[in-house]
């Protein structure tokens, strides 16, 4: 089952762990009591060794999915979780921040899954997250020893709000008998999350206050003084639980190493852009697209044409994903602690996703996106004064005529650019180095000087006739009087590999009234065959 979060393979997980050689692993499948993976090819698996999402299983894999807690109906070969015994819980645990070991989670597979506490599915404490404890850690120099413990800190989030608890949609989502089944939705999510920026939260302290507003923000002064003590989630953690697979994805710009404390970049992925001014501005997450897997996305809830899931400290909601409206895919991010108004403030901008209008594929097979930055910049228009202007004229208030680039409103889209387009420099003393990896490309919005020009540009860009022209031009058919080739009807609005990544192609759709003119079968619908009709 592609969706069910990976429970583990019996190995402790940490920042240096990159999986297990499956050819040497016990030959048992995911439905076995050990929960180990099976791969006879001998290739190295880069799957996380534990589910680092806000979803887990109360019972072991065999008890939950092997039959004792499932039912089959209508002769279907796919088991459906029995609602009366729905053994799913939110919050897989947090990492151990004690003794300076903030970059590893030392909870063993036995303790994290509760497999050592249960021989089957019977018993009230079988895999109960409230009974799962964090292991004790002893450190002597560089040597660490992990000791199983029966008592200790809980390894789950005790204060997750009800808004992300499993719902009645879970049985359908975890079966393959529903159009909006989990496997199809995961294909959608994996493609989509590879082409849009994503926010990840700070895990907080080792107590029952995980999602306070102050944990979502980082001060520039703290960045400048000590970039290592902010507990940034840029080291591969989701919900405070380290994911070794994500460590390889993240771009550790804040990690110092080598001689002279020279900052070094490791595996290119994502990182944080430190505010340029010495103020309390929020850090900006930069990403060329994340390759999230089903193991990294939690609390998937499918309801009608809406899909919601938890990613880090945010609940991401996509509306109209089954039948997206013309040129629009609704996106919404909500802080997990929805009871606190300040918690809903994103670390980017008040309404970052209001800028997203959709994506499509050009004739080169690259994803292009439409971003409306007026909503993101609107709150900054009245205070747009550069430092140079303030220094020369002493002006402290803006005229409102200019719309400078919002420091927290950078645009990122999956596309291929020259490596020279983004070359962040790192220096130490007289030493300078340039990282020119094409994975680090950063596409910034064009600087708009007049608000009316922004309005006109967006109107032109989103006008149905302009969209039609762009589509025809992209495929080199703007001057053709022939019917569109069949390939356009079947291969264009799909998810596929784009430049080495799995990108989503959300077509800026053509209204029905223009369908006959364009003769493209995109209305029925773009996601047909992936997440249902």
Swiss-Prot record:
Region spans: Disordered: 15-45, 92-166
Pfam families given in the database record: Adhesin_P1_C
Similarity remark: Belongs to the adhesin P1 family.
Residues in the signal sequence: none
Disulfides per UniProt: none
Feature: compositional bias, Low complexity: 28-45
InterPro entries, sorted: Adhesin_P1_C
Compositionally skewed regions (Basic and acidic residues) per UniProt: 95-107
Name listed for the protein in its UniProt record: Putative adhesin P1-like protein MPN_409
